[in-house]
Design a protein with these regions (language model features):
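Serine-hydrolase catalytic core recognition
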Residues: 1-178
């Protein structure tokens, strides 16, 4: 699918239950880790795969590399500079809408998201800023305020010294939106 700019290809994977019935509607669970130091869509076989495990519970699970992740181009990656809260959400949502337009079993009225560490931060941000799309989130060990997390990691993506962009990207500052 194309991303927010309507031309950049966004890559992702879809996991369906092994007893998938194309006539049924399935909730969607996004497995997210939008840390800018890597990409999340697996490029290799994994013996143990949490996305596969959740799909077996009766959901369609997706993993998407939105803008802000690396290994594509500098412009693609720079979306996250001082903007970790973006997490590629406009691209992720466009990708899932494209999936639903091609697959009638995808129920976009039931989209949940989960992640750990930076993925936990992303999962919480999904329901803070995109609650019209994501109806539930599970955030494991999220670094919800980059002013209180390991600075060596954060200053790579947020810069130094700490400035107003840290507050703009803080889930804690926006917790009242829940």
């Amino acid at each position: 699918a194309n991303g927010r700019d309507a031309k950049t290809k966004i890559w992702g994977l879809v996991y369906r239950p092994s007893n998938f019935d194309p006539t049924m509607k399935y909730p969607v669970i996004e497995n997210i880790y939008a840390g800018p130091h890597g990409q999340h869509v697996p490029k290799w076989f994994e013996l143990r795969n949490r996305s596969r495990e959740y799909a077996e519970l009766g959901a369609i699970v997706v993993q998407i590399d939105g803008m802000g992740t690396n290994w594509r181009s500098k412009a693609f990656h720079d979306v996250c500079w001082k903007n970790l809260k973006d997490a590629g959400f406009p691209d992720r949502i466009a990708w899932m809408r494209e999936l639903a337009s091609r697959d009638s079993s995808v129920d976009l009225s039931r989209v949940a998201i989960f992640g750990g560490s930076a993925g936990g931060q992303n999962a919480m941000r999904a329901v803070l800023d995109y609650s019209d799309f994501y109806c539930a989130a599970a955030a494991d060990c999220g670094c919800h305020d980059n002013r209180m997390d390991k600075i060596w990691w954060n200053e790579q993506w947020m810069g130094w010294p700490v400035d107003e962009s840290y507050a703009r990207n803080s889930n804690m500052e926006d917790a009242g939106k829940l």
